[in-house]
Structure formats: structure tokens, C-alpha cells
Amino acid sequence: MAISPQELTDIAYKISERFEKVNTYYLVLMAKQIKDIGKLEKDNIHRLRQMAIMGNNIDSINSFLSLQTGLALNDIFELYLKSAIEEYKDVAYLYAYRGIKQPKFKENIAIQNYIESVRKLTSNTFENMARTTVIAQSYRDTVDLAIDTVATGIDDYQSVMRRMLIDKAVAGTKVMYASGITRRLDSAARMNILEGVRQINMGVREETGKQYGADGVEIDAHGLCAEDHLPYQGRQYSLRAYEKLNSSLQRPIGTCNCRHGVSYIILGVSPKTYDDSELQKMKDYSNAKIKIRDKECTRYKATQLMRQSETNMRYQQDKIITLKNAGMKYDKEEEKLKQMKKEYYYISKRAELKPRYDKAYVPGYKL
């Protein structure tokens, strides 16, 4: 059976923890150097020496990033293979219906060539991410400010550097794209993992559909679905009808963070995965009104609030780790994290959803 969207999301978070480790390593090394600079007298500040230390640290961070990128790619390729095999198994009965012998998975050349093309694309994407991760300039700006603050003696070192380090903790390690747009490394990794699996699944489904002569599609269905796709999920359409429908949607199926995919079917042969009553239950569940404090929202919207809370808790932990390693007070930050955790738990209980503290995990901190 195909891996569910929720399982894929969970796996993507797990793999992307490798890049969370890189982020933590970067923040810790930078914070420790800022702590050491703060112990120096202005007459003992040697900019070149500090730049050399910074350079060694950046080299170490980049080496660690390269290592974690390689390990992540191994995990991703294993996921691709597992997902592709499950997708291939699921359509064996459609080959049989057409009287076509389904080739062994490894002997289906078209499928293997497609998977290899996605593997190469993914490898290039992650290697480019590693090369374009913005570490050096961010680190240099922080060290420059630390040296200047000590050298001039005008401003309070702890206050100035505390603000700078908090900003760097929230920003984290960033990937810079050719367009100039930046994104946090961990977020970029998760996005690319999920997109890669989506490409694998859709490619296998499309190619097998061609091989056994599919004449329709079924749109996947899942609970807690966005309102704009609720009327269509779980439904079967002819190929032409689906193409017309999808081109009419402002947010087409399978794009813009949509977790839906389509299975290529033979109309009248492929059974519906969900009957109308089951789809209605999913719709009712997603649209159920939830009262959070003095505001009302749908259960689906509550899941979005939870995802944002998980992100905010990760950033807050990054602040605490950074301040702790810089030898600065972080009690207020820890208190705020406790309040964030309570609010997250409150939202989950109001919406009757399971808290996912694993999605707020940051290496080096016990939430």
C-alpha cells in the first residue's frame, strides 16, 4: 500500500533533522566565539586572529553540512525506492485486467529511468543547497560587531551582542536561491524532500497508467483538507474531465503545498477508495468549528496554527541554545517557551488533535 501523505511528512521531518543539527552546530560555534571575544580587553583584540578562528569554524560547519547532506541523500533515495515500489504494487491488478503482464519493478526500464532522473535532480538540488547556504557573511557580520563593540567600549557588549545573536538564531542557516530569495535550510530541505517524493509517486503513477491504458484518475483524500480542495478529493474523473477541472482551480491539485496526488485508474474497474459517506465525514471533520480563546476557526485552520506554533517553538529553542553557549541569560526565553508550549497544547486539545512535539524538535534541547 502506498505511503500516506502524513507518513511522508513525518519522514521528511525526520530526515530534515540532519539540517537542524547543522543549524545548531553553526549557532553554537558562533555563540562560543562571541563569548570568548567578550572576555577580551580592547587592547587585546586582534581582528586577524578572530577572523582566523571564524574561518576555521566556518570550514568545520561546511564540512559538517557536506556530511549531513550526503547522509540525507541516502535517506531520501531509500524513501524514493520504498515509495515507488509500493505505488507499483498497488496497480498490479490493472495490468492483469488489461491482460498485460506487469514487468518486474527492476525490469521496467521506463520507471527505472524516471526514478534515476529524479535522483539526479534531487542530488543536484541538495548539493546546490549545501553550496549556497549563507553562513560566512552572517558569521562575519556577527564577529565584526563583537570586535567593534569591544574595541570602542562605547556600547554595552552583552546588550549589543544579545540582540545580534537572537536575530541570527531566528534567521538560522539560510539557503540563497539564484533569484536572491533566502529560506531556512531546514525548511528548504523538508520542502525538497516532499516535492521529490511527490515527483516519484506521480511519475510512477503516470507511466504505469500509460502502460495499462488508464482512462481516468482518482484524487487522493485525506482528513484536515484545505477548503478549496474538499469538494474534489476522493472523487474519480475521466482524464479529460480531470484536466478541465484542474485547469480551472486557482490552486491546482498537487501544487502550492497541496498534499493531494492522483492515481491513474480504469473507470468502472478501479473501486473508489472512499464512499460518499466517508468523504462527507472527512469534510465535516475538516470544517468543524473550533473555539480557541475568543476566536472561532475550522479544525483545518487549527492544524495550521499548530504547524506555526511548532515552527515558533523551534526558533525559540534556537535562541535559548545560542544565548546559553554565549554565556548570556536565557531565563526569559525559557519562560516564553513554556508559555508557547502551553498554548500549543491548549490549541491541540480544543481541536482534538494530537500534539506533535516531534515537529518542534531541535537537536541540543529537550522540549
Which residues are covered by each model-predicted region?
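N-terminal leader/targeting and assembly helices and adjacent pre-domain segments
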Residues: 1-163, 276-367
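Acidic, glycine-rich two-metal-ion catalytic cores of nucleic acid-processing enzymes
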Residues: 167, 175-176, 183-280
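Contiguous, non-catalytic segments that form substrate-binding/exosite surfaces or channel walls
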Residues: 122-212
